Structures are given as structure tokens and as C-alpha cells.
Amino acid sequence: MIQPDGSILGLDYSEERIRYAKQHYAQESSIDFQIHNLRDPLDSMGLFDLIWVRFFLEYYRVESPDIVKNLIAGLKPGGHLCLLDLDHNCLNHYELPTKMEKILFELMNRLEKEYNFDPFSGRKLYAYLYDLGYQDIQLDLRAHHLIYGKIRDEDLFNWIKKVEVASMKTEELFEDYPGGHDAFFADFTKFFLDMRRFTYTPLILCKGMKPLFP
């Protein structure tokens, strides 16, 4: 991925993840990992040829445009910024019973308004780069999730855990569901085990080049 004499720097604000990364992936002298919050500028790290940001902006709905500006300040002229995020996150299921679908949409709406989560982050990536005058913008759309027929155990676990963690912040949403919170998750699990079920999540990849001249 890098040329001779090049280097890679991985950033994360989690000490635990950085520690894990250093233990497992930092054997090469050209790879380093540092704790850093991408909401803060990259001033102390020099300029990069390529910045790659995956599954981060969705957690900062309000701050995302400013975060992208911070990233751009850390790029060399002619460097590339690559943004990757999901769109319509957690919301694409067929044929989900109406009461369950209603709760999922209310849940994501609550996370968006009260917890700054952005289930529609992916569709905004192109506009971020376009508005900042980036050149040679390229996009790709892929399936991050594409589940039909028999579900893999790890996919079932991940989906149940994802909705379970989110629901802990909004337990009152389940008060009107027949049987409450526990019944919802029993029904949600039953839905995912049904081989007729179809679930997908779009992953949008957006790459652009910083202009050589301002």
C-alpha cells in the first residue's frame, strides 16, 4: 500500500483499540498508531498523501462537515481523501412486521436527534468533497450487509447486539410493543432466522483529490 520510504499512521481515540493495533500490526517500522480524536486538527502530524476514514462520521452528525475540513488541512496538495460510511443504516429489511419496523425507525430517529448518530451519513460524503472544491471525485456503492436465505451465526449475533445496544438508550420506545422489550427482541430474532427475510445496508465510498492550488 505504501512506496519505499513511506509510512502509515493509524489514529483512534480509544486507548484499548490503539493498544490492540500496536500489539498485532505494528511489527513493521513503517506502521505506527497514535491516540487522536479526529474532531481535533491534525496539525502536529504533518501532511499526508492519503487520508482514509471509515465508519467515523456517522457518530458525529452535527460535526461531520467540520471534521472533513480538519482532515483536508492535513492533506498535501494533490493528496486524496477517502471517506467510507453506511447509508440508511439498520433500516433496510423485508418483510419486517409493521410494528417492528416502526420501532426501528423511531429508534434511529431518536439516536439521530439525541445522540448525534447519523444513519444517513453515506449519502452526504459526495457533497462534503464537492462543496470544498475537491477534484476527480469518484464514488462506489457496495453492500456492507447482504443477507438472504440462511443467516450466518456471526451476522445474527451482530444484528441483535447492534439493536440491543441502541435500544438501551431508548427503552421507553418498547412500552407499547406487545410483550415489551423482551418480546421485541424475540420477534426480531425470529425475523432474522426466517430464510425469506432480506436485509441489506449500502456502503458508500467517496474519494477526491485536494486541488494543487488553492
Where are these predicted regions, by residue range?
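A short SAM/SAH-binding and catalytic strip from SAM-dependent methyltransferases
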Residues: 48-65
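Conserved SAM-binding loop
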Residues: 21-22
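Conserved SAM-binding strand-loop segment of SAM-dependent methyltransferases
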Residues: 27-40
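C-terminal helical/coil "lid" or tail adjacent to the Rossmann-like core of SAM-dependent
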Residues: 140-197
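A short acidic, Gly/Pro-enriched loop at the edge of an enzyme's catalytic core
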Residues: 39-51
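A short glycine-rich, Lys/Arg-flanked "PGG" loop and its adjoining helix->strand segment in the class I
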Residues: 65-80
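Conserved SAM/SAH-binding beta-strand->alpha-helix loop
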Residues: 14-16
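Conserved catalytic/acceptor-binding region of the Class I
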Residues: 82-151
